């Protein structure tokens, strides 16, 4: 059954929650300044030096993913639908 497409705001809220609760402590010490693409449904993620590369790698594994991209160690995030 296909997953319902989320609104941009929902992707942002879920992605930030996943980053803050699961990934921040794991990723910031080693990957500060890189990008993490987070699938907000599966909570799978991919880290890369380039936002598009992180997104594309995650889409390769999860073609239907709904992705938030966060710069590790920085406050801004953006949606990569």
PLM region descriptions:
Residues 1-30:
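Short N-terminal "domain-start" leader segments
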Residues 25-75, 80:
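Amphipathic, hydrophobic secondary-structure cores in small proteins
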């Amino acid at each position: 059954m296909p997953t319902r497409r989320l609104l941009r705001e929902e992707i942002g809220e879920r992605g930030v929650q996943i980053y803050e609760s699961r990934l921040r402590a794991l990723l910031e010490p080693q990957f500060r300044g890189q990008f993490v693409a987070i699938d907000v449904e599966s909570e799978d993620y991919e880290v890369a030096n380039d936002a598009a590369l992180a997104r594309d790698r995650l889409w390769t594994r999860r073609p239907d993913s709904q992705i938030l991209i966060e710069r590790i160690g920085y406050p801004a995030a953006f949606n990569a639908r």
